[in-house]
């Protein structure tokens, strides 16, 4: 399978867990995975839409990897979806380019899982249900999502967040 990971972290240089996930995936899958780091691909506020669409067409599996930010996806990933999933490409008349490609959501949450279970009315999976509609609308089977919690970690000990990310990436 050709795996495409769309990294929606707004600044990977500040992330321990998300960077570790990408490193672990690269180590495991080698040349079978392509990673698009959106924080490096947006130039002057815009994406190269034809290049992004080409990467999607070449993939069998599309992984959206991102940190949960205020119980949603990053604005960077949202812009990418808005720009790239165009009418006639992802949906609508002749919009069949994504049909049959597997979609996997891979998200990290800074808070520990207990916070979502005891202090908030919904857990992370409930806040990301928009992907069920996106997958259905574009004809992509939605795979079981992967979530990692507690990825903010201890600022004095970034190894904890990296370890969580490495485990998530396996």
Where do the language-model regions lie?
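Helix-loop-strand module that forms the ligand-binding subsite of alpha/beta enzymes
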Residues: 51-132
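Short beta-strand elements in bilobed, periplasmic/extracellular small-molecule ligand-binding domains
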Residues: 31-39, 141-147
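Surface-exposed cleft-lining segments at the edges of enzyme active sites
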Residues: 42, 114-121, 156-160
């Amino acid at each position: 399978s050709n795996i495409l990971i769309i990294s929606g972290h707004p600044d990977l240089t500040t992330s321990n867990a998300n960077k570790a996930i990408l490193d672990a995936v690269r180590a495991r899958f080698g040349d079978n995975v392509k990673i698009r780091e959106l924080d490096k691909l947006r130039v002057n506020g815009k994406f190269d839409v034809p290049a992004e669409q080409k990467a999607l067409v070449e993939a069998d599996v599309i992984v959206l990897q991102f940190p949960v930010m205020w119980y949603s996806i990053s604005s960077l990933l949202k812009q990418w979806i808005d720009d790239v999933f165009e009418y006639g490409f992802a949906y609508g008349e002749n919009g069949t380019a994504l049909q049959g490609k597997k979609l996997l959501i891979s998200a990290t949450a800074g808070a520990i899982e207990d916070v979502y279970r005891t202090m908030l009315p919904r857990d992370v999976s409930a806040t990301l249900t928009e992907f069920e509609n996106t997958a259905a609308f574009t004809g992509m089977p939605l795979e079981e999502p992967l979530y990692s919690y507690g990825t903010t970690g201890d600022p004095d000990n970034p190894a904890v967040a990296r370890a969580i990310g490495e485990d998530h990436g396996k």
